[in-house]
Amino acid sequence: VSRWLLRVGLALTLWAPSASAQGGGEALQAFLMTMGPGASIYERFGHNAIWIRDTTTGLDLVYNYGTFDFDEPGFVGRFVFGRPRYWLAVGSLDTTLRTYAYFQRDVVVQELALPAGKKAELALRLAENLLPDNRTYTYDYYLDNCSTRVRDMLDVILGGALRQATEGTPGEGTLRFHTQRSVSNDAAMYLGILAAMGPRADAPLDQWGEMFLPAKVQERVRELTVSDSAGNQVPLVIREDTLLQVGVHAVEPTRPDWSGRLLLVGLLISIVSVTGVRRGRAGVPGRTVATLWLVTSGIAGLVLLFLWFGTDHVATRSNWNVALLNPLGLLLIPMLWRRRAASGLGRWDVALGTGYALSLFVGLVAVWAGAQSTGEILALAFIPGVVTFVVALVLSLRPVPALPTPR
């Protein structure tokens, strides 16, 4: 969203709909807009916005809480540390539809059966949120995002009815469940996010918490009833219209299970690595693969530790995957290549090997005990971890061939 559009949108917002709102809101219509997923990782969860139409002036304004700028100074650093800055922006309906048509994303709108006074309140609150001192917030993918901001705004307008209807009612899944099914189109991103998520991601969600997903806000709003002027319960949604239907970037209804294919990858790594015990050049390919595994898993473990202790990402804390992708593996690499010292394994080697082996065991027990839903990471990492450890141990204990006796 350009700075020019933001300035123009702000001026228009504070002028036309606010004037109609102050006139009682009779001329206003309020819509929940739900955008389908896109191709990029930050588009995979979908999006939503609130559209206010002023039937007197013909002005259509779309309020979007998901605005950010990659080029903003410090954005990448704040994103990495879990403190990205997003803001509320406003644009025209025409610009919004052209943007989503360009990115081949669906757009569905639901007109809300709000009394005139509530529509006026909604327009005024959105205009107030757009003020420079109010429009910026610290974004969290699961707890405070474009969708939860829309959810919370609607709940305030509805006098808490949305929260009352959904809080405590079991949802469809967990943060991990919804994340897996949303990003399954990108194998590398899928595996990375799956590894990075800790046990917080496995806590069951109620319908209120599940509305971090725009599609869930759409569903709950569709189901909700409110009292009309006569005190009768009527659907909150007057009508639902599809403004754009492309259907290119679908999200799976259930999460995939990659355990089988990841187990095969782990077995392949292990089979090649075990040949590293061969003497001479015959063992070099196996030791090379074992080294690559220890480097990859060790660096991954360091990243997990950073996400756990060094950032504000709630979903990455207390992550048992660190036990399976252990940084100690980086220190095992010299054992794959050096000749055994005459005195045998040193105390450091024993301590290092023991720590690494215990770590793998802890990771195995954690998965079996249900401490964290990381079966796919276990399938990938456990057997290669054990095999590379055994190969390093065998090579370290193997006697050095005796030199030929000079004649």
Segments (PLM) and residue ranges:
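Initiator methionine at the very start of the polypeptide chain
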Residues: V1-S2, A21
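Sec-dependent signal peptide recognition
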Residues: S2-A11
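N-terminal signal peptide c-region/cleavage motif recognized by signal peptidases
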Residues: A16-S18
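Soluble extramembrane regions of membrane proteins in the secretory/endomembrane system
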Residues: A21-V251
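General structural signal for secondary-structure boundaries
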Residues: G91-D94, P115, T174, R255-L264, ...
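Core alpha-helical transmembrane segments of integral membrane proteins
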Residues: L224-V314, L324
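Generic detector of multi-pass transmembrane helix bundles and their immediately adjacent loops
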Residues: V295-R407
